[in-house]
Amino acid sequence: SDEELMRLSEPIRYDDIKFETETYRAGKKHIKKTRYKDNPFGKIVGRHDGAQFYTIGQRKGLNIGGHKDSIFVIATDVPRNIIYVGEGHTHKGLSRSCLRIASQDIHWIRTDLAMADGEIRRYRVRIRYRQPLHDAFLIKRPNGIFILFDIPQRGISDGQFAAWYSADDEMLGSGVY
């Protein structure tokens, strides 16, 4: 159903570890300084200079120590300046099996192959430059295209491109999610 596709395409939100915001002025530039905060226990584990500087899957530059496994950014909320992080390479917040590209952000190179609402097709999709192609279903709905990957993809971030290809590796279309 459309509701299920929307739910699957949204990043999973976790409250494992997040940041608490403090705002101050530094010179002429307004900077939001925040603290990493472990929600269940209120334990502060670090600081950062703004959610806008972090991407999903980022591990470097977090300056959080004392954990068994590496800490990764699993979600960001830039308007509220919150960063959610999780521990370990296999944290479920790092991967998603579905993403949505809004209708206005879809570009068909092969306009003769553009999908109609309700249509489902099988393509090979890439979400990063030089990434291997991955099998996925593209599902066209009035509010956009949903890409449902066979294998969940790691580090899907807003603002990235997805490009879909035919079986003979011809790029057919793309979009920003």
Each model region followed by its residue ranges:
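AMP-forming adenylation/ATP pyrophosphatase catalytic core
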Residues: S1-Y177
